[in-house]
Amino acid sequence: MGKIPAIGIDLGTTYSCVGVWQNSKVEIIANDQGNRTTPSYVAFNETERLIGDPAKNQVAMNAKNTVFDAKRLIGRKFDDKKIQEDLKLWPFKVINEKGKPKIEVEFKGERKRFAPEEISSMVLTKMREIAEVYLGGKVKDAVVTVPAYFNDSQRQATKDAGSIAGLNVLRIINEPTAAALAYGLDKNLKGERNVLIFDLGGGTFDVSVLSIDEGSLFEVKATAGDTHLGGEDFDNRLVNHFAEEFKRKHKSDIKGNARALRRLRTACERAKRTLSSSTEASLEIDALHEGIDFYSKISRARFEELNMDLFRSTMQPVERALSDAKMDKKAIHDVVLVGGSTRIPKIQKLLQDLFGGKQLNLSINPDEAVAYGAAVQAAILTGVGSSQIQDLLLVDVAPLSLGIETAGGVMTNLVERNARIPCKQQQIFTTYSDNQNAVTIQVYEGERAMTKDNNLLGTFNLTGIPPAPRGVPQIEVAFDLNADGILNVNAKDNSTGKSEKITISNDKGRLSKAEIDRMLSEAEKYKVEDDRQRERVQSKNNLEAYIYACRQAVDDAPSGVLSETERSKVRDKCSSEASWLDKNSLAEKEEFESHLKECQRICTPIMSKIHGGKKGKSSMGKGSHPTVEEVDG
């Protein structure tokens, strides 16, 4: 078997998707439920950890211990305004640990705390496992996507999540850029085309303007967006609307009932999807709260009214990206829609009107385009695939200006917003007072004139500057922004040659190497536990299936084949084992196996009489038993 290829993962707020370049094309890989996207949900209960569809499916019964939206927490500080707003809506508990948000759940009877990176790493692990089943081997390398408007600490934290998941993250790439790759390859473009990617997903929003030359040079001209806007916010408006309606109709408030709110949210999500193709949607929820059934309807017009300010707010980044790219709307050849929320007719209408009635391009799958592009980039970086993709060149940009604080708290930019990456910029600075022997370099990102209004990335000192009048020392500060959009800063005193450097690892938001190592070993431990739980359930199912098959065989056996004593012997043994199973459903794998052996010891000789003469065909031969995958109803 050849080398296992690198994969592309779209790590989404609400759903994730994985793809791989194989046989000269991208394969989007379906999960074990047959779905090509997997919910970014992780659930913890008394016995196991669930990831993806199984986690989302049980959320109403276990709302407090089912975690989602990790992407809205990752790389942010606990006191971030957006996190404080979200806290009011999340059913799970988020606590403040040294300024960082941590998620607290109950798992196997114990309180556990997880960093957002750990939850994201569990989703990444699930996506890796989906790919491994398909590819038939261990996957090590991956390209992971992030919103174009993610800042330095959010990018670093996503990379850390990849490390905890045991992945070698080849590159962090921007979601709209990945979607543009998918579009460019799919359409086999000729000549130079200016493309605007409008990417509105479950939790984040990006706009990127690119020029694509001959379908091989992809150059991002500008990017804009909002890392906290998406389908979930539209769901929130619906949830609030119906919660108020319930209160009006039934004089009862459901806001303190986590299970009721979760069931209402699931119904609202479904209604929102229905309203993309119908003008009205119904909600029917039995015994929503205090035994009260809730039935209601909502029209598309009312849904649009509830969200109009959010819908309109998506147009401003479009205008800003065009302005930064120095392009007129008329210069855009294709407006390409990506992300599930672009299916909303009103958003399409607003965008179409903004472009003077221009036909929007709906030709790529909005749920899969980002993973598709990530898989292409993974193939490019590992040197596989045809010249069709090896000749592709991708030029991206920095989403935010980067600079240092100078006298008076002024932000002095070294890297301007929308500068091409990777890039290096340097500038000479000097001292502010006589005989100053050290300078503190404070690195910020953002667009405001004063550093207090921007985001502090990191601080370091350059010491040992020889005494001199103010303005004489020459301190060269160099910014090196790599292809992942992650920053290294170097400061050098030109008179002594002494230098200090820092990789912006944002101590306020980022995990230390030791923390990552600890989380990696914990992730391994959880995997062992998950595998053990899977084996335990399988051995329980095997025993259950064997009991059922023996009973069935005895009941169906023609008269005369077995004596009444033999029939009773099998039935009695099966009854006692079934009774033991009922009382010991949480027993260990070894116990189930031991009971199965005991059951086989008594039943197999009798079973072989029923199947006598059918040597080799019996599914009840010595030591064998039917393997039946059972599904809880």
Curated annotation (Swiss-Prot):
Keywords: ATP-binding, Nucleotide-binding, Stress response. Pfam families: HSP70 (PF00012). One of its GO terms (biological process) is protein refolding. PROSITE patterns: HSP70_1, HSP70_2, HSP70_3. Signal peptide: none annotated. GO terms for cellular component: cytoplasm; cytosol; nucleus; plasma membrane. This is Heat shock 70 kDa protein cognate 2.
